[in-house]
Regions:
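Intrinsically disordered, low-complexity Pro/Gly/Ser/Thr-rich segments with frequent PxxP/GP/PP motifs
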Residues: 1-6
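Glycoside hydrolase catalytic-domain context in secreted enzymes
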Residues: 9-19, 23, 43-453
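Short beta-strand elements
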Residues: 25-43
């Protein structure tokens, strides 16, 4: 990425191509000559100021061209990529949402929360359909189904044992791994039990149902296979189980780059290499989405690299590093596999929450890459957020305005924030009716595509 031109380029010169079985065992295969610098893609100058200047060497390192290797010439024009991204047709979905009141529209862009349940993500009828799933889109509109969303990453994370009584279905066990809750304090444990669908009152099941799902290998293990075909087979398995359980969007795969062993998500974040991570995640995506009505939610978009203070931490990244490294794997998946959904990360990028960045969500993701799916937040639960730090947690109205269609899992505080911005009562952000309609229409379009009408 050339920051001066806001474009990806290949500079003029000779490129030595090496081939072999590993990085330690290669031989020169050819020398490719580029007579002049080629502009591969024209992009936008976005993503903010990191507050520092990238180090650049005084001069590029010179490598002697190997004798005897074939020499090939490439015309710069042949490397040009003109990606025409047609706007998604929202005509029918807009016609649906334009008839809704402001109050109804505000529900459309939130998860299907239960009134008064500020810390729950198993809400509405989700516990009746797939107990232990992380959440769902709204169920408040007749004739508009909900999108059911079980978490990942190692298969579908749902409650393995379900009890059914006169009030409906409920989880007998948490879908979190055994021992996980032992690391939490009592307040956090209660919040997570609530999120996972465990009843907060004594209930005696009249009938028991088992819904065990297959555990697939963790992300790093899949990536170590170097096999997009294996990844696709595992995605196919998950897609088949989504068919069985009636899930629509799997909240996986995740693939920010490994930078430090201290990142708590490295086990699912595939690789330190953007090409490998992108190709493996694309394989998983193709496997799941070969099943009609099933989709992945690639995450966490983007630049997340720590769990501590992750709702309020800021990643400072140069535009070149962002384009060449940290966004590259996401770009590969979007262009090659067309995922149905993407989840933003908690962190900020150069001072702006990724979930509140129109430059990231509209300019890069949709305008440059041609993403046509649904964008949702990571789960912003009231008990987890803090607003007294240098970087307060993200809130609903700026998130919706920026191009994030679903603020998850949603609560009444989030809805009132949207309505306040819509009425011009929020000093920080103003949300227009047309902006809210567009985001709601994107939700409706995906519901129709995956769950029908």
């Amino acid at each position: 990425y050339d920051e001066g031109r806001a474009a990806t380029v290949l500079e003029a010169g000779d490129y030595v191509v090496r081939a072999g079985a590993s990085s330690r065992d290669t031989t020169p295969a050819a020398v490719v000559h580029l007579a002049e610098t080629a502009v591969v893609r024209e992009l936008h100058d976005v993503l903010g100021d990191p507050g520092f200047t990238d180090w650049r060497p005084a001069a590029p390192a010179a490598v002697e061209a190997p004798a005897g290797a074939p020499r090939l010439a490439v015309e710069p024009a042949a490397l040009r990529r003109a990606d025409g991204c047609e706007p998604v047709d929202l005509t029918d979905a807009l016609e649906f949402v334009e008839k809704l009141s402001d109050d109804e529209l505000s529900y459309m862009v939130l998860g299907d929360y239960r009134d008064g349940a500020e810390s729950q993500s198993i809400i509405g009828s989700a516990a009746q359909t797939l107990v232990g799933a992380a959440g769902q889109s709204t169920s408040r509109f007749e004739g508009l189904p909900s999108l059911i969303m079980p978490d990942g990453p190692a298969g579908l994370r749902i409650a393995p044992r379900v009890g059914i009584d006169d009030d409906g279905a409920f989880a007998l066990d948490s879908s979190m791994p055994a021992g996980f809750e032992e690391l939490m304090d009592e307040e956090s444990r209660g919040m997570f039990d609530s999120m996972m669908g465990v009843s907060d009152r004594p209930r005696t099941p009249k009938r028991l149902v088992e819904q065990y799902a297959t555990a697939i290998p963790i992300g790093t293990a899949i990536a170590q296979s170097w096999s997009p075909e294996l990844a696709e087979a595992l995605g196919d398995l998950v897609g088949a189980e989504m068919d069985h359980f009636g899930a629509h969007l799997w909240l996986a795969p995740a693939f920010n780059l490994h930078r430090s062993i201290l990142c708590g998500r490295d086990f699912e974040y595939l690789s330190e290499d953007p090409l490998l991570a992108g190709r493996v995640a694309a394989g998983i995506t193709r496997g799941v989405q070969k099943h009609p009505g099933r989709g992945v939610t690639i995450k966490h978009f983007a630049f997340n690299n720590q769990e501590t203070n992750r709702l309020n931490s800021c990643s400072h990244v140069s535009k070149r590093a962002a384009r060449d490294l940290y966004l590259r794997s996401f770009e590969i998946v979007v262009r090659e596999a067309r995922p149905h959904a993407i989840m933003t990360s908690y962190n900020l990028l150069n001072g702006v929450h990724t979930s509140e960045s129109a430059e990231l969500l509209e300019t890069v993701l949709r305008d440059e890459w041609g993403f046509e799916g649904l964008v949702m937040t990571d789960w912003v639960v009231a008990g987890m957020t803090r607003h007294d730090l240098k970087h307060p947690a993200a809130t609903s109205a700026p998130t919706i305005k920026a191009g994030n269609e679903l603020f998850m899992p949603g609560c009444e505080t989030d809805r009132q924030g949207i309505l306040s911005a819509l009425r011009g009562q929020d000093e920080q952000v103003e949300l227009s009716r047309s902006e809210l309609e567009k985001q709601a229409a994107r939700v409706v379009r995906m519901v129709w595509a995956l769950a029908g009408s």
